[in-house]
Amino acid sequence: MKRIIALLLFASLPAWADDVSGVWKVDGLIADHPIAPTCTLKQTDKQISGSCQVDADHAPNVEGSVKEKQVTWKYDQEYEGTVYTLTYTGTLDSNTSIKGTVTADPSDTSGDFTAKKQ
């Protein structure tokens, strides 16, 4: 009887998402412009923090979240005098791969990205 209770308790626990902490190499295309930041992410519970190295002089801070296999993070980047918020929303395919969509607001443009854990 104790085994059955223990199994039922274990089965009722939520599935834990993989930890996305680490360095991720992102490759994508948004409005025909390639994007290739290297993002250093830190997951604490369901929250993501860190930074994305966009170029040699720019590594904006990121914020985001993880819910099961769904991963979202964003940062601000200036391009031709306009500040855009790039938001990455993807699915953790494995411990080393995220695939999804990136959007740039306020332009309402989007594209696809793949991130590989280094």
Model regions and ranges:
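Generic alpha-helical structural signal
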Residues: 11-12, 101
